[in-house]
Amino acid sequence: MSALFLAIPLTIFVLFVLPIWLWLHYSNRSGRSELSQSEQQRLAQLADEAKRMRERIQALESILDAEHPNWRDR
């Protein structure tokens, strides 16, 4: 008898509530996956900054290689 009290609400949940819940969850998730215009601009800006930082690091390493050849061994 106690199993019946648990089985009926669980069956209703699995048959009606769970499919609607999953459908709403994943339909909202797919709509949010696109980046907004400001997010795309920020991403491009960060990529440019990373490129400039990489170039500066390479320049600094070439200066250190010329002035102190064994600096990487430390």
Swiss-Prot record:
One of its GO terms (biological process) is phage shock. Residues 33-68 form a coiled coil. Induction: By heat, ethanol, osmotic shock and infection by filamentous bacteriophages. It is found in: Cell inner membrane. Keywords: Cell inner membrane, Cell membrane, Coiled coil, Membrane, Stress response, Transmembrane, Transmembrane helix. The chain crosses the membrane at residues 4-24. It is a single-pass membrane protein. Pfam families: PspB. Belongs to the PspB family. The phage shock protein (psp) operon (pspABCDE) may play a significant role in the competition for survival under nutrient- or energy-limited conditions. PspB is involved in transcription regulation. Interacts with PspA; could bind PspA only in the presence of PspC. This is Phage shock protein B.
